[in-house]
Amino acid sequence: MASTADFKNGLVLNIDGQLWQITEFQHVKPGKGPAFVRTKLKNVLSGKVVDKTFNAGVKVETATVDRRDTTYLYRDGDSFVFMDSQDYEQHHLSPELVGDAHRFLLEGMTVQVAFNEGAALYIELPVSVELEVTHTEPGLQGDRSSAGTKPATVETGAEIQVPLFINTGDRLKVDTRDASYLGRVNG
């Protein structure tokens, strides 16, 4: 059990038998009336996001989530295979569980997999990854009034928007949360 004072981003709550992860929270102390906590909760299994308000001091049941470092090995038909870095056990995860993260998965990449009672819940990619551009059209200078972008396909097959000076073969740093270009990687 956790009090609303213990709320933090990433905490997983068990509400009515379903697991919800706190993505945002705010303690509110109005001029009149009791304090409360406004939260945004994401359903761990379905990905659905809801707003929920808790009275300050209320106790809420938490779920035990074990985050383990794993290495992405390969895709096997309809599943993604990850190996636990501690006990070398292999876990076959469904495309639904992996979600949009598959757009940035490279073989040998270390990712965190969250488990609850032995069952995988979701994966957490690093905030940024380095990927090579496999295809992009050449950017033309001077054909616009402001700085422009163009689509580029990276080695995982994902398409991201990049500045016009990026060429095929360049290595980029990409934000995995929103698929945005962060910069070029030298070397």
From Swiss-Prot:
Pathway(s) the chain acts in: Protein biosynthesis; polypeptide chain elongation
CC terms in the record's Gene Ontology section: cytoplasm
Pfam (any one): EFP_N
Biological process terms in GO annotation: peptide biosynthetic process
Localization per record: Cytoplasm
Stored CDD domains: S1_EF-P_repeat_1, S1_EF-P_repeat_2
Keywords in alphabetical order: Cytoplasm, Elongation factor, Protein biosynthesis
One Gene Ontology MF term: translation elongation factor activity
Keyword Cytoplasm: yes
Function per UniProt: Involved in peptide bond synthesis. Stimulates efficient translation and peptide-bond synthesis on native or reconstituted 70S ribosomes in vitro. Probably functions indirectly by altering the affinity of the ribosome for aminoacyl-tRNA, thus increasing their reactivity as acceptors for peptidyl transferase.
NCBIfam families, per the entry: efp, PRK00529.1
Family: Belongs to the elongation factor P family.
The protein's name in its UniProt record: Elongation factor P
Organism from which the protein derives: Mycobacteroides abscessus (strain ATCC 19977 / DSM 44196 / CCUG 20993 / CIP 104536 / JCM 13569 / NCTC 13031 / TMC 1543 / L948)
Gene name of the record: efp
